[in-house]
Amino acid sequence: MIPKRHDGSAKTLFGLTRNFDAAEFCDTVLAQPKSAEYVAGRLWQQLASDDPPSPQALGRIVSAYGTGRDLRALTQAILTDEEFTGGRATVVNTPIEWLVGVIRALRVPAQPKMVHATLRTLGQRPFYPPSVGGWPSGQVWLSTASAGARLHAAIQLAHAGDLSSIESVAAGDRIDAVGYLIGVGAWSDRTVEALEPLLHQPPQLVAAAVNTPEYLTS
């Protein structure tokens, strides 16, 4: 912080002019009629779906949020709402979520240079967002270019990781074993068909599995 750059004059916010401190600023913003819907909708898109909630779901979670702006109640309402519990594959995992998930699942030894290079290529370096609004979400992470980068990284990680739980089972059981290893409970018929040619190549099988729709979304 550079004190001489601080502007200590009064500011006008939503028609109110004063020297706002942090608490007054937040109170003024949260007093706006649409603030509850905005906050609830943004948290929904962080936790439940890349798409906004339906008007019905939004009404339920805003009601839980209440006039007291209870974030714990709002979070609980989202995670127990029927549109959340009944949904599947509605949130695209960010590059950081994807990469950390693969590294943890395969127990890959630390490889800082590879991690940094992969996240830089995928466009999500920690602490370097493109703007103060953070990184985008949703389909933007599923571009053709990012698919190539993910596959390249996945092959490296698969060769460096622990695949003993895959290699130790019969070839016919390996797709289920991969699902158990990376946390995918069920595969679509189309995905199974795509993975079957790789049954005798565990590293390639795992690399392909972590690039399927079932793993890239949650």
Q: What is each PLM-predicted segment?
A:
Residues M1-P52:
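Non-catalytic, conformational "gating/processing" segments within enzyme and secreted inhibitor domains
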Residues A40-T67, T75-S218:
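Flexible, low-complexity segments enriched for small/polar residues
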Residues S35-E37, R69-R72:
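Loop/turn elements at helix/coil->beta-strand transitions in domains of secreted/extracellular proteins
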